[in-house]
Amino acid sequence: MYAIVKTGGKQYKVAEGDVIEVEKLAGTPGDAVQLAAVLLVDGDDLVTDAAKLAKVEVSGEIAAHTKGPKIRIHKFKNKTGYHKRQGHRQPLTQVKVTGISSGK
């Protein structure tokens, strides 16, 4: 059984036991999380009906908090001596999917 969930403005295909990296979620490692925005569930039959999907929940636990790769930003304006250098690392959360409720 797998589900497609939406979190942090992105969609992820998850199954029980998967570890996914999502935008930072509040909580400490070991805390339980519910991914309620389920877009599709496929098990014995495919479910796409919004009324049925409202009952489905994907549960997981926070495995770790990490950072994404370093992104370097360099702004430059010609003939003025203006240089601005900046770096960014996006905070991420690793979530281990522990279950997908069928909502029946």
UniProtKB/Swiss-Prot annotation:
GO MF terms, alphabetically ordered: rRNA binding; structural constituent of ribosome
Superkingdom of origin: Bacteria
GO cellular component: cytoplasm; ribonucleoprotein complex; ribosome
Classification via Pfam families: Ribosomal_L21p
GO terms of biological process kind: translation
Alphabetized UniProt keyword annotations: Ribonucleoprotein, Ribosomal protein, RNA-binding, rRNA-binding
Family matches, as InterPro entries: bL21-like, bL21-like_sf, Ribosomal_bL21, Ribosomal_bL21_CS
Purpose: This protein binds to 23S rRNA in the presence of protein L20.
Quaternary structure note: Part of the 50S ribosomal subunit. Contacts protein L20.
Similarity annotation: Belongs to the bacterial ribosomal protein bL21 family.
Protein name stated in the entry: Large ribosomal subunit protein bL21
Species of origin: Salinispora tropica (strain ATCC BAA-916 / DSM 44818 / JCM 13857 / NBRC 105044 / CNB-440)
Gene behind the chain: rplU
